[in-house]
């Protein structure tokens, strides 16, 4: 494998990205990383007409034997719960996230039955799965690493990940807000804190920029427009941009598109365009910026005809060249 591969698995409304890069020091000569894992809800995969499938099914069908690195960009059900299911089959050697490595040890399982709406239920399950994912990683001999803006981490020969967010202040705020939630004993106040943390979680996302020779890939998790403050414009420049927050109206604007100036944009919106993902205005401004648009699923929009597929694979050269291909099956 002379080039890097970045595959966006069709997990419906969610995100799951498989990164593969040549590394002679690894078994099989390939470094593998899974960035988020989509949802673990069975209902997400009842209709598979667009090609969607749980990430662990995709990985198994690909014949993968291990995952060197897993990245949890933030604790929302459509990102972390599928990651846990993948970790049950492929316990990672390393897990990246934002909280201190041992932070999960001070947390306890939360009662999902107290939820008063679907959003609270999803978030409670995500928080519980965060604890389980950390515990599973460590019990299988893996390590947990906390990342903050300013770090650059080598991944394999020629490839590194630069952390653009969260800032030290935001990472500390996430830690404090999480601690306050778990310490709350009043039921009403607990639910208020739960919803507040849920609402803030997107902009606690890890924002990663993968640097591979001249190619730069910007992966902002669910960050919306309010989450890029403090990041220098030149740091956002990228040839491939996974638009934040599933391409909803707050996922990008012209100012952000002008800073990134991508040749290609990937939108991780579901075929049913839940929560108004793949918003037409967002897609229009990204296309107007000169970018080619690609989708992890098949959102139904006028003049958009994305074929059913299990995944979208980019082959990326060190010179910044991109080759995209929809894979009909794993």
Show where each model-derived region lies.
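Active-site environment of divalent metal-dependent phosphoester hydrolases
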Residues: 13-15, 41-42, 75-80, 102-105, ...
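Active-site metal-binding motif and surrounding structural segment of the metallo-beta-lactamase
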Residues: 22-33, 40-97, 233-248, 261-266
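Active-site-proximal beta-strand/loop segments in catalytic clefts of secreted hydrolases
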Residues: 22, 35-38, 73-75, 98, ...
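Acidic/histidine-rich helix-loop elements
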Residues: 37-50, 178-185, 190-193, 248, ...
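Divalent metal-coordination and catalytic microenvironments
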Residues: 10, 19, 36, 74, ...
């Amino acid at each position: 494998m002379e080039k890097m591969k970045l595959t966006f698995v069709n997990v419906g409304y969610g995100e799951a990205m498989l990164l593969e890069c040549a590394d002679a020091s690894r078994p099989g000569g390939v470094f593998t990383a899974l960035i988020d894992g989509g949802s673990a809800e069975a209902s997400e995969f009842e209709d598979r007409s667009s090609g969607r499938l749980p990430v662990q099914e995709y990985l198994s069908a690909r014949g993968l034997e291990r995952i060197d690195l897993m990245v949890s960009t933030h604790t929302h059900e459509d990102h972390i719960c599928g990651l846990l299911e993948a970790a049950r089959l492929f316990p990672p050697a390393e897990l990246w996230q934002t909280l201190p490595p041992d932070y999960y040890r001070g947390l306890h399982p939360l009662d999902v039955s107290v939820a008063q709406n679907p959003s609270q239920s999803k978030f409670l399950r995500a928080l519980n799965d965060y604890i389980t994912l950390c515990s599973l990683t460590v019990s299988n001999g893996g390590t947990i690493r906390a990342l903050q803006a300013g770090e650059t981490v080598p991944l394999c020969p020629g490839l590194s990940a630069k952390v653009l967010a969260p800032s030290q202040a935001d990472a500390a705020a996430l830690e404090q807000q999480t601690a306050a939630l778990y310490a709350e004993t009043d039921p009403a106040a607990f639910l208020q804190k739960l919803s507040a943390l849920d609402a803030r979680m997107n902009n606690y996302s890890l924002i990663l920029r993968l640097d591979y020779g001249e190619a730069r890939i910007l992966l902002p998790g669910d960050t919306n427009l309010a989450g890029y403050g403090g990041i220098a414009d030149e740091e956002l420049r990228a040839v491939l941009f996974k638009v934040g927050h599933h391409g909803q109206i707050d996922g990008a604007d012209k100012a952000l598109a002008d800073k990134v100036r991508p040749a290609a944009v990937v939108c991780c919106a579901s075929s049913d365009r839940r929560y108004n993902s793949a918003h037409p205005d967002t897609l229009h401004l990204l296309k107007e910026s000169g970018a080619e648009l690609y989708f992890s699923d098949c959102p139904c929009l006028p003049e958009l005809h994305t074929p059913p597929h299990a995944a979208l694979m980019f082959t990326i050269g060190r010179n910044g060249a991109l080759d995209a291909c929809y894979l009909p099956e794993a």
